[in-house]
Amino acid sequence: MGSIQTSKDQIHVIIGSTHRFSHLEKAKVIGAHLIKRGYRVTILAGPSVRDEVESIGALFAPMQGRAGGSPIKPAYNQPPPPWAEEMEVSALKNFFIGPIPDEYKSVQDVLKTLRETEGEETKVVYMDDIICGAMLPVYFGAPGAIRPKGVIKIGTTPLPHESAGTPTWTLGIPSPSTDSGSVGDLWGTKKEIYTSDDIQGHFENVLREMGIPADNLKPGSLPRFMHSQGTCCDAYLSLSIPEFEFPRSDAPESIQFVGALPTVGSVPSNLPEWWDEVIHAQGPAKKPIVVVSQGAVNNDPTDLILPTIEALKDEDVAVIATLVRGPKIEVDLPSNVKLAEFIPFDILLRHTDVLVSNGGFGTVQMALSLGVPMVLAGVYLDKYYTNSRAASMGAAINLGCERVEPSVVKTAVCDILSDQKRKERCLQIKEKYAEYNALDKIVDYVDALASKP
């Protein structure tokens, strides 16, 4: 991009983030690495996480208004469609598109302050993930917008880019191995949601109210919202590997795969009191470790955690159930089950034989990078695509539903524990991920964009 390297003391990296746990943790990991390498870093997020951000040595700036408030948290324990359709539409309108004006203003305020305090000699590189749309108004012609030297989109979902003949999770096209029937109906519904005039019209109205020129909003001029999130940047760095995605012969050069982040989450000051007893057991006491977790949003334990506990209560395994800030479980636990509110996955998965999860891109990428086979549930947002791709790679059994039956989980876990070929396949995938260094690649792009003419 440029032949003259800009020195680190001339570069200021701004990272935009929601304060949802999984997204903020990735911003902190990237920010901490940049700070360690000598860059100045400002992280924008909700006011409630100021202390977390400042604990890594980053400067903090608040996301304002809707961008800094409590994230939309649908009640995922509602019935299946049509409610599920309403949930996805609500999430797109209220969580992805609705906060764009406040995200834009928050970032522009920081850019203006840096220009006033540090001058034109400071090269600002901005990055965020697909949740944040702060740069979209800049690309579509917002009046008076300050444009940073470079814009990086960190890919924390499957690729949102539309492509000729290639399915994306936003277009509702399943992988070739996906069964028909209700799953096909689900994907058809998802396609209708993500390509609907309702969603696109809402996106256009938000931009129109921000003063985007009318010519830029004419039919055919404005790409679909999710596609915009993948293309309105100088570099889209997917936290995955090419083998996870369908090949795209027409993919723009801006799309690059950088592998999974090496860690997400900070090591807790003290692990559960039972940690050594379970993790470092020897001899007959050593059991295969099955971890079950539902993440921070879809955390109704009757969907997955409780059915898994029931399924494995008589099996010769050690079960670790993590709630990840979810509701308390008020049941008597079998003797082979241990409960924890939260243990960082980068620690826990290194000792795990099978992960039972409702999936999601970040969790699946970490498990793949560590060679851990999975039993996956979950169908909303990107989860069905993500989970079906993991299954297509040979690393998972995808149950393809939101609420599971104990007998189905039991069969899947036992199949994985007895399947040596699947274990070998997971180790092969782990070796693929080991070829990448996500943090170093992100640094390379920061340097390249800051140094471009």
Swiss-Prot record:
Its EC number is 2.4.1.-. Pathway: Secondary metabolite biosynthesis. One of its GO terms (molecular function) is hexosyltransferase activity. It comes from the Eukaryota. Keywords: Glycosyltransferase, Transferase. PANTHER family: STEROL 3-BETA-GLUCOSYLTRANSFERASE, STEROL 3-BETA-GLUCOSYLTRANSFERASE UGT80A2. Belongs to the UDP-glycosyltransferase family. UDP-glucosyltransferase; part of the cluster that mediates the biosynthesis of a highly modified cyclo-arginine-tryptophan dipeptide (cRW). The first step of the pathway is perfornmed by the arginine-containing cyclodipeptide synthase (RCPDS) avaA that acts as the scaffold-generating enzyme and is responsible for formation of the cyclo-Arg-Trp (cRW) diketopiperazine. AvaB then acts as a multifunctional flavoenzyme that is responsible for generating the cyclo-Arg-formylkynurenine DKP, which can be deformylated by avaC. This is UDP-glucosyltransferase avaP. It comes from Aspergillus versicolor. The gene is avaP.
